[in-house]
Amino acid sequence: MKRIGILSDTHSYWDDRYAKYFEHCDEIWHAGDIGDEAIIDRLEAIAPVVRAVYGNIDGANLRRRLRPMEIFTTDGVKVVLTHIGGYPGHYAPGIRSRLDISMPQLFVDGHSHILKIIPDREFNLLHINPGAAGKQGWQTVRTLVIITIDAGAVKDAEVIELADPPTNKPRR
């Protein structure tokens, strides 16, 4: 059994709560738009395995260090991890053929800043977009996802909302 922490779209923003929520995870997956290599370094200090892909805002250093897509198997579950993927019925160009060829049980992407955990009946997989963990973007709630994989199946998914403390701005 493995616990996997999933995040995306940090856009160089680090929140110490990533470490708090992911401290008991066996792996952490970052679905791109990392922003700063230090984010990956900090995640590597939390979990023994970190898998990450670069996103459309990531610069040359991250593009040299990471790939745009990772395909791997963990605890019997085949996974495709990428940044721009779309969602069931509306996949980005090239993704449908990749899913056809790879036949994963789990497809993880980011980019939209929209949290989605939905089954894709056409490809017989679970689609997860963890939403955005960073502050850049239009999302109103920052999110992380933790899943449990056991004996070749995703057993559960937990959504974590990272509520920001209210600011004490003076009223005018």
Give the predicted meaning of each segment.
Residues 1-50, 58-68, 74-76, 81, ...:
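N-terminal active-site segment of His-dependent metallophosphoesterases
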Residues 6, 52, 81, 129, ...:
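Structural signal for conserved beta-strand scaffold positions within catalytic alpha/beta enzyme cores
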Residues 9, 33, 55, 83, ...:
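Active-site glycine-centered loops adjacent to acidic/histidine catalytic or metal-binding residues
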Residues 12, 36, 86, 114, ...:
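Short active-site segment of divalent metal-dependent hydrolases/proteases
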Residues 59-61, 88, 136, 165-166:
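Short, small-residue-enriched loops and turns at beta-alpha junctions
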Residues 74, 84, 130-132, 149, ...:
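Active-site donor-binding loop signature of nucleotide-sugar glycosyltransferases
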Residues 89-153, 157:
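Conserved beta-sheet core of the metallophosphoesterase superfamily
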Residues 157-169:
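Short, solvent-exposed aromatic-acidic interface loops
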